[in-house]
Amino acid sequence: MFSHTGSDSVYFNRFGRYGKGGAYNDKNSPYFSWYKFNEWPNNYQSWWGFDTLPEVIEETPSFNEYINGKDGIVRKWMKCGNSGWRLDVADELPDVFIENLRKAVKDENPNAFLVGEVWEDASNKESYGARRKFLLGEQFDSVMNYVFRDAILNFCKGQHGKYTMDLIMSVIENYPRPVLRVLMNSLSTHDTERAITVMAGEPLDSKDRE
């Protein structure tokens, strides 16, 4: 996840675990410009308000270089044999960062796979006040198909088949064919309830769902 780091990391170093450096302790730290301080050091922007997860400014040149540069994190792991990347919370990453990351990945291995976590229809997703470019050829090869998950599970719970088909057809009609062929379809992930839990409904009389 490239939208934030841990507060207890060498980059932020809130608790001094890594000596006197880090953005929290030193304004001259090479990592200081990565973070969004409202009032240094204790008031900083963090992911969903969790102060253990300070947000980074992905457009910062030194951060981009650290992740996507010639000797950056992405290329390092590609050289180690990584065959692809799944980008968490893709809608929180700026277009330019995703495009730079894609270039780093494809430079190392043109056949490597890049998939984004997008919960809605990725063809018309809006964030950062603009329509996103996830599927226009310069960012992701595919995305997670949560639209499919919702359609199938709701159908199994009694949703009318027409509504289910409308959801599935919207993806088929909106997504480029190369993306459709490699969509990441799933009924459960680490971010959702398991399908069996959704299907079973709520526990009754203090009994479990079995």
Segments from the language model and where they lie:
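A broad, low-specificity signal for short, low-complexity segments enriched in glycine/proline
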Residues: 44-49, 74-77, 144-149, 186, ...
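The substrate-binding groove and active-site-proximal loops of carbohydrate-active enzymes
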Residues: 49-66, 82-92, 150-162, 195-208
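Active-site-proximal substrate-binding groove within the catalytic cores of carbohydrate-active enzymes
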Residues: 159, 169-210
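Substrate-binding/active-site clefts of carbohydrate-active enzymes
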Residues: 1-79, 107, 124
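Active-site-proximal helices and loops of the catalytic beta/alpha 8
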Residues: 2-19, 73-75, 82-183
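Short, structured coil/loop segments at alpha-helix boundaries
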Residues: 9, 60-63, 71, 145, ...
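Aromatic-residue detector
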Residues: 32-38, 64-73, 85-86, 101, ...
